[in-house]
Amino acid sequence: MSRYRGPRFKKIRRLGALPGLTNKRPRAGSDLRNQSRSGKKSQYRIRLEEKQKLRFHYGLTERQLLKYVRIAGKAKGSTGQVLLQLLEMRLDNILFRLGMAPTIPGARQLVNHRHILVNGRIVDIPSYRCKPRDTIAARDEQKSRALIQNSLDSSPPEELPNHLTLQPFQYKGLVNQIIDSKWVGLKINELLVVEYYSRQT
């Protein structure tokens, strides 16, 4: 299944706020109206919606998300927590969380068009897994810096997660540590996502 490129507002109306996909928010009460129209949700549908929330927020294909679930399942610790850490430490998400891109699709575009350096080298893979002490910066070119400056200027002031440091005047961010689960940028029940996939196999 390919990455979603359809109307974004339609998705947030059904699934709730997805800040990685769009900075628009559903109108208050719209999810309650949707629920009353559709009646009581089945357990399968609840798990499916949590999975879709994760997929659309991080802008993943079905195959990519399944791959991350399998990697998380083989790692030490809670599969759900490891899954969120893997997704949060992607380069496109780090750029978004730093405010250097307005959305995750916007961050992906910056990376694909070779505007971003990691530790002084161009990285053009949005799924690149960032590590503690990685430095993320704009290329030393006017266009690259202008794109990031536009995003920094238009981003609403929000508390930066404690695993990141932003140096806006240098168009640069630093990864301090692996993200703590309380700083994940999406309201999600990750256990339902893991359950969804465990029942598919």
Swiss-Prot record:
GO terms for cellular component: chloroplast; small ribosomal subunit
Which keywords annotate this record? Chloroplast, Plastid, Ribonucleoprotein, Ribosomal protein, RNA-binding, rRNA-binding
Q: Where is this region: Disordered?
A: 15-44
Source domain of life is: Eukaryota
Q: Which GO terms describe its molecular function?
A: rRNA binding; structural constituent of ribosome
What InterPro entries has UniProt attached to this entry? Ribosomal_uS4 (IPR022801), Ribosomal_uS4_bac-type (IPR005709), Ribosomal_uS4_CS (IPR018079), Ribosomal_uS4_N (IPR001912), S4_RNA-bd (IPR002942), S4_RNA-bd_sf (IPR036986)
Q: Which GO terms describe its biological process?
A: translation
Q: State the SUPFAM superfamilies in the record.
A: Alpha-L RNA-binding motif (SSF55174)
- Where does the record place it? Plastid, Chloroplast
Annotated S4 RNA-binding domain ranges read 89-149
Pfam families given in the database record: Ribosomal_S4 (PF00163), S4 (PF01479)
Assembly state and interactors? Part of the 30S ribosomal subunit. Contacts protein S5. The interaction surface between S4 and S5 is involved in control of translational fidelity.
Under what name is this protein listed? Small ribosomal subunit protein uS4c
Q: Which organism is it from?
A: Helianthus annuus
